[in-house]
Each structure stands twice: as structure tokens, then as C-alpha cells.
């Protein structure tokens, strides 16, 4: 499935036309390649239009997008930041906050709704996305 041009434009604008990890210091590779969209919920074989909505997409450089699916440590790091979410979770993936460089947010289409850091981290621990202080 292909993300619509309108949704792509909305997500890029919401994320300031930069990789969501561009301003974050982390031990993984720096940004590389053109911008692309990262589905926060894996679509699996064949995909589904249900996951092609702005609240389930973030902007990533091609390098980080590739690492998110090919490097287990980086995938765990992304999970702890809400950038990768389990498709099999019993919780609505839209409720999972995302950690940007300037704080936690819940994504609502073209809007980032601020979430208190303590509340976001407690929620992430509850769903098993944060273990052993993985969020950096």
C-alpha cells in the first residue's frame, strides 16, 4: 500500500521536515539518506491501509528507517521511544506516545499533543516498551 501524498505532506510538516532522530544524541549511526516515512506499527506482508494514517507514521531518514527493521538493538531503542509499536498489542497503538527531541507527544494527525514525561514513561513501562532505562 502507498501512503497518500496528502498524508505524506502532513507528516513531514508535523515533523518539521527532518528525521525524528536528527536532534537526538544516541549511540547509533547519524542520519543518512533522504527522508522517508516510518510506519510505527509494522504492516506485515501485504500491508494494510489502516496503518497509513498520519498518527501512525513518523519522518525518518532512510538510514534510520532501514536500521529500525534490520538492527535488533536499534529496534529496541525505537520501541522505547514509541517509534516502533507491536501490531499484536491489546492497546490502541494511537495511544502510545512518541519521544521527540523536545519531549513526549501523542500523535493526532497533523498535531503533536504534549504528554507529561512521567506519564509517558509510566505508560511505556506498562506496555513493556521501556525496560532497564532504554530511553535516552
Descriptions of predicted regions:
Residues 2-36, 58-64:
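Short cysteine-rich loop/turn motifs with clustered Cys
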Residues 6, 73-77, 122:
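Exposed alpha-helical structural elements
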Residues 10, 14, 77, 81, ...:
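Residues that form generic nucleotide/phosphate-binding pockets
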Residues 27-40, 69-78:
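Short Cys/His-rich "knuckle" micro-motifs
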Residues 39, 61, 109:
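Pocket-edge structural micro-motifs
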Residues 44-55, 66-111:
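Polybasic, low-complexity binding patches
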Residues 101, 108-136:
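Charged phosphate-binding loop/patch that engages nucleotide di/tri-phosphates or the phosphate backbone
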Amino acid at each position: 500500500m502507498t501512503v497518500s501524498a496528502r498524508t505524506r505532506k502532513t507528516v513531514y510538516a508535523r515533523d518539521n521536515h527532518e528525521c525524528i532522530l536528527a536532534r537526538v544524541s544516541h549511540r547509533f549511526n547519524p542520519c543518512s539518506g533522504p527522508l522517508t516515512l516510518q510506519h510505527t506499527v509494522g504492516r506485515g506482508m501485504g500491508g494494510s491501509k489502516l496503518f497509513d494514517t498520519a498518527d501512525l507514521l513518523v519522518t525518518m531518514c532512510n538510514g534510520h528507517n532501514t536500521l529500525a527493521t534490520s538492527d535488533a538493538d536499534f529496534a529496541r531503542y525505537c520501541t522505547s521511544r514509541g517509534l516502533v509499536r507491536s501490531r499484536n498489542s491489546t492497546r490502541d497503538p494511537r495511544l502510545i506516545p512518541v519521544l521527540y527531541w523536545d519531549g513526549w507527544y501523542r500523535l493526532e494527525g497533523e498535531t503533536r499533543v504534549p504528554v507529561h514525561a512521567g506519564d509517558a514513561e509510566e505508560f511505556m513501562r506498562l506496555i513493556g516498551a521501556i525496560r532497564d532505562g532504554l530511553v535516552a
